[in-house]
């Protein structure tokens, strides 16, 4: 669940994005201060909008915001009060982590993409399709996992590139908006001593 808030641009609306809706036709069901956004074809909820959000709790900052469990509980109380059966889940796992490329094979339908198996934790490996020219087996880099919001506002969801499933993105310094990031293509390269699954820390993982 990706939570965003920008009172100046959007108004006092807390926006909670659950899934990528793609090109699907969307519909809205509103009850009180809660609006459910769902796909018409599957009746699947893809987002919630909470109006007059500051009446539930104080919200600091703008752009992506991170809710406490207590705040999510308060929103769930409102969903229940308005008659919605679904409940919000507060996913507090880090979405930008150290990843290590364990395997890499050429994409069968591309001359520049590779299909990578990337360790993102002690017991977790994900498949990521990438076109970085410096990608190689053994490289440690920063991975944006599904549920991440990039500095430019784009959201990371499970997807596919030319028919091959991809569950995240290996990031370049420029995509992470790091200071003095080189303009050339290529994902960030970390020290071999870094451990897969470690949360991304710009102060530690980036040296200008």
Where are these regions (language model features)?
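Phosphate-backbone binding interfaces of nucleic-acid-interacting proteins
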Residues: 1-208
């Amino acid at each position: 669940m990706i939570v965003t808030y920008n009172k100046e641009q959007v108004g006092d609306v807390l926006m909670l994005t659950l899934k990528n809706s793609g090109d699907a036709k969307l519909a809205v069901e509103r009850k009180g201060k809660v609006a459910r956004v769902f796909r018409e074809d599957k009746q699947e909820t893809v987002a919630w909008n909470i109006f007059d959000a500051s009446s539930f709790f104080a919200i600091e900052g703008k752009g992506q915001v991170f809710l406490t469990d207590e705040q999510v509980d308060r929103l769930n109380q409102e969903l229940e009060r308005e008659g919605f059966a679904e409940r919000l889940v507060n996913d507090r796992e880090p979405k930008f982590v150290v990843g290590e490329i364990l395997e890499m094979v050429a994409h069968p339908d591309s001359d520049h993409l590779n299909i990578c198996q990337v360790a993102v934790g002690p017991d977790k490996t994900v498949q990521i399709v990438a076109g970085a020219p410096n990608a190689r087996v053994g490289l440690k880099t920063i991975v944006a996992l599904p549920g991440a919001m990039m500095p430019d506002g784009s959201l990371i969801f499970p997807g596919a590139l030319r028919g091959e499933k991809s569950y995240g993105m290996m990031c370049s310094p420029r995509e992470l908006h790091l200071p003095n990031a080189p303009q050339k293509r290529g994902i960030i390269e970390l020290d071999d001593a870094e451990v897969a699954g470690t949360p991304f820390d710009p102060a530690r993982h980036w040296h200008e």
